[in-house]
């Protein structure tokens, strides 16, 4: 009789543990799905912000403006951006600006200063240094290439 009570108790205990396990697993699945949904929404938001920034590359983009668009603090914004795109917003922006500048210098007869302004660089000396560092020659030298 004592053994019977222990077996009944064990089955009840096992059943309770199994129920608890199922409840915990169910909650975990729901929170994971919600997390994926919010990650997906956040990724979509960042894709829109990135598209806006890269489409309007000639405009001055500040960290504050980008953070406000995402409604995030600076560190959160940069962390998310890096996770989604494996880069920083300013690196993406400057890379696109540089490609546009190389294209304009190669295909248009424009002064270097005008190319810099058209590509969103407000400072000619910064543009020239950045261009030389990344292309191995000055913008003027690039424009004279055959």
Segments (PLM) and residue ranges:
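Short, solvent-exposed positions on alpha-helices
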Residues: 8-16
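Helix-turn-helix
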Residues: 65-74, 78
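Core residues of bacterial helix-turn-helix
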Residues: 70, 119-120, 131
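Short, small-residue-biased leader/transition segments that mark boundaries at the very start
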Residues: 3-4
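Linker/hinge segments immediately adjacent to helix-turn-helix/homeobox DNA-binding domains
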Residues: 19-35, 79
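Terminal helix-turn-helix DNA-binding modules in bacterial transcription factors
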Residues: 51, 55, 60-65, 82-125, ...
């Amino acid at each position: 009789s004592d053994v019977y009570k222990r077996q009944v108790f064990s089955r009840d205990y096992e059943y309770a543990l199994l129920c608890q396990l199922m409840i915990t697993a169910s909650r975990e699945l729901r929170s994971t799905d919600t997390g994926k949904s919010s990650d997906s929404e956040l990724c979509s938001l960042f894709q829109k912000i990135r598209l806006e920034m890269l489409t309007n590359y000639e405009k001055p983009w500040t960290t504050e403006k980008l953070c406000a668009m995402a409604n995030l603090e600076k560190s959160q914004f940069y962390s998310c951006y890096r996770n989604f795109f494996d880069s920083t917003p300013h690196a993406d922006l400057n890379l696109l600006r540089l490609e546009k500048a190389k294209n304009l210098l190669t295909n248009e007869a424009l002064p270097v200063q005008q190319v810099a302004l058209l590509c969103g660089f407000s400072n000619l000396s910064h543009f020239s240094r950045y261009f030389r560092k990344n292309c191995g020659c000055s913008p003027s030298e690039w424009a004279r290439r055959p």
